[in-house]
Amino acid sequence: MGKFHTTLPQSHIPWILSQPVFFVSTAPLSPQGHINVSPKGTFPNINSFGYIPSHDSDPRKPAQFWYLDLSGSGSETISHLYEPGNGRITIMFCEFRKAAPRIVRLFGRGKVLENGTKEFEEWTKKEGVEVIPGARSVVVVEVELVGDSCGFAVPVMEFRERREVLNEVFRKRVERAEKGVSEESMQR
């Protein structure tokens, strides 16, 4: 049986921050549009995602979850968040390790801070986020509701390693751009 919380229980935060993968889901407002679900890998050595609790100075301000969005395939999540009147987003974490089963969903409204903008620069500096090559944006989610369910049907899987392919592609692009190879512009 699932439970819903208006705030994220403090006991969940270390668990969330230990996850090697999470899933992001958005949808357009149009009934003809498709729901988009994207897996997101995390990075152990950089501050690539996190949780910002509500501020005591304004308890009405919701807590926030954020992640560093990298270039790669499409940018459907961003296009859904930019759609006028939309902004709906769900972040889902699952326990795949041999630990107590659990699924946590963060429901909220997302905002895109695009790389190259003043807002992105100020936000990443304030939050101590290392901007790596290929970082297209930061997605900030104002968490409106937290769903917590058992996860009894989620399989147990062993995490082996992170894929470094995308990071390596962008590292090489930076090297070529620094050598003056103009056709190798950095995508955001």
Task: Show which residues each predicted segment covers.
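Binding-site signature for planar aromatic cofactors or substrates
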Residues: M1-R188
